[in-house]
């Protein structure tokens, strides 16, 4: 069973108390309550940057097993992708971002993170002297950034600038 993590931070404490009260009064199944508990505990650990990603992943994996709502699952899968990104496990991260987007195609942050990974891989290919592979990665990054920007036009200004500079997208 996950342990509740409430530190001395007033906002964290308040959020945890409110979440626990809502969990008790909102009509939900026991499986949904358990999924939320695992999700909340995983999210709290991640947000507090305790560095215990293995435990956070265990909570998120358990939450995905218990959570049936596709929208809620999308955020759990997205957060798993974040941990894999932080750990430098880019292939796994991409897999979880894809899975999140299958359930919720309106996650611009997932598209952005996928673009960042592809852009990084393009830069790595350049360092290895493979410009053809680099261009393929950069093109893929551009496609993901276009999707993120389409969902939230006022965001991702650096990505928009990169797309303009590299002539991968024209903005009005």
UniProtKB/Swiss-Prot annotation:
Keywords: Chloroplast, Membrane, Photosynthesis, Plastid, Repeat, Thylakoid, TPR repeat. One of its GO terms (biological process) is photosystem I assembly. It is a peripheral membrane protein. It is found in: Plastid, Chloroplast thylakoid membrane. Its main location: plastid. Essential for the assembly of the photosystem I (PSI) complex. May act as a chaperone-like factor to guide the assembly of the PSI subunits. Gene3D superfamilies: Tetratricopeptide repeat domain (1.25.40.10). This is Photosystem I assembly protein Ycf3. PANTHER family: CELLULOSE SYNTHASE OPERON PROTEIN C (PTHR44943), TPR REPEAT-CONTAINING PROTEIN MJ0263 (PTHR44943:SF8). Belongs to the Ycf3 family. GO terms for cellular component: chloroplast thylakoid membrane.
């Amino acid at each position: 069973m996950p342990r509740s993590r409430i530190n001395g931070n007033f906002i964290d404490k308040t959020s945890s108390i409110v979440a626990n009260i809502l969990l008790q009064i909102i009509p939900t199944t026991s499986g949904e309550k358990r999924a939320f508990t695992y999700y909340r505990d995983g999210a709290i650990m991640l947000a507090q940057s305790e560095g215990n990603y293995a435990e956070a992943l265990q909570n998120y994996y358990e939450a995905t097993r218990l959570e049936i709502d596709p929208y809620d699952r999308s955020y759990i899968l997205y957060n798993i992708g974040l941990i894999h990104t932080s750990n430098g496990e880019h292939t796994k991260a991409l897999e979880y971002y894809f899975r999140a987007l299958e359930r919720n195609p309106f996650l611009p942050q997932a598209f952005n993170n996928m673009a960042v990974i592809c852009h990084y891989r393009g830069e790595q290919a350049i360092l290895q002297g493979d410009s053809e592979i680099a261009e393929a990665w950069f093109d893929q990054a551009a496609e993901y950034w276009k999707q993120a920007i389409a969902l939230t036009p006022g965001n991702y200004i650096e990505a928009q600038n990169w797309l303009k500079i590299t002539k991968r997208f024209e903005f009005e």
